[in-house]
């Protein structure tokens, strides 16, 4: 797919602490069976791993739409993201400061905020929210899991279109775009070892913004060890402040006038 990159994004500001690990590439096996467990909220369910309680977000399916609701995570819990989890129109997910979410390698995990859905991820300088690989430190590699995707209803020059990377989700407002659309808050968030290539030229990036509106708050983001672009924008009117990237394998940032 031939695209025209029109903007090299703003200078990086290394405000969040970067993770240190090996940064060699690695293959990704196909999806495995979902874990057994009891759903707690329709989105999260718990399971014992040895003496630890682990809370799974999603069931490992490539298309797991969370039942409609407002989901609030707990920073004291151990979370694993499994499969492609969709926060649909009318639903929200709130992630408190200090929460760590580990992406499952086997199911190529990704969190997708669809049009009308919202994420409220408010970290702090001392307690950032971290999305990272579930692999043990020293074994983590770029592309261990998918990444974070936000889809909105703001303007682009192609109307409604499917987001890059393979998920079912569409972005853009068609003939009635909403440039003030609000997909929530990303503040003091770190994403590590993401960037799974679903197909050639259809990669899931560290963080992808599809027609995200100006009502969305985005600041103090860091993507490290991404296998594809650290950040990618497709149209939209969102303003992003203080973004940084380290140890990348593809482009730092891409923005397309779409």
Residue ranges and their predicted role:
Residues 73, 93-95, 119-123, 186-189, ...:
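All-beta strand scaffolds that present successive hydrophobic residues in beta-strands
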Residues 73-80, 95-100, 117-131:
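Extracellular beta-strand-rich, repetitive "passenger/adhesive" scaffolds
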Residues 52-53, 60-62, 180, 220:
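Coil residues (strongly favoring Ser/Thr
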Residues 246-253:
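Conserved small/polar residues in nucleotide/adenosyl-binding loops
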Residues 66-68, 82-94, 105-123, 137-156, ...:
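Extracellular beta-strand-rich solenoid/capping regions of secreted or surface-exposed proteins
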Residues 96, 102-104, 114, 122, ...:
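Feature marks extracellular polysaccharide-active and adherence modules
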Residues 3, 8, 13-49:
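Bacterial Sec-dependent N-terminal signal peptides
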């Amino acid at each position: 797919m031939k695209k025209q990159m029109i903007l090299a994004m703003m200078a990086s500001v290394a405000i969040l602490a970067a993770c240190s690990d090996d940064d060699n590439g690695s293959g990704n096996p196909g999806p495995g069976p979902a874990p057994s467990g009891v759903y707690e909220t329709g989105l999260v369910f718990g399971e014992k791993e040895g003496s630890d309680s682990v809370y799974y977000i999603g069931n490992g399916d490539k298309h797991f739409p969370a039942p409609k609701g407002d989901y609030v995570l707990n920073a004291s819990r151990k979370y694993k993201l499994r499969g492609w989890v969709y926060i649909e129109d009318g639903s929200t997910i709130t992630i408190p400061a200090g929460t760590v979410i580990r992406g499952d390698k086997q199911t190529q995990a990704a969190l997708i905020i669809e049009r009308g859905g919202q994420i409220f991820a408010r970290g702090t300088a001392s307690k950032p929210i971290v999305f990272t690989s579930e692999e043990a430190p020293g074994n983590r590699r770029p592309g261990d899991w998918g990444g974070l995707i936000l889809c909105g209803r703001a303007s682009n020059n192609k109307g409604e279109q499917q987001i890059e990377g393979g998920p079912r989700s569409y972005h853009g407002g068609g003939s009635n775009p909403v440039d003030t659309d609000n997909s929530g808050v990303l503040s003091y968030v770190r994403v590590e070892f993401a960037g799974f290539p679903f197909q050639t030229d259809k990669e899931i990036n560290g963080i992808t913004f599809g027609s995200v509106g100006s009502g969305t708050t985005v600041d103090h983001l860091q993507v490290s060890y991404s296998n594809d672009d650290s950040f990618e924008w497709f149209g939209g009117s969102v303003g992003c402040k203080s973004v940084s990237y380290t140890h990348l394998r593809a482009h730092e940032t891409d923005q397309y006038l779409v």
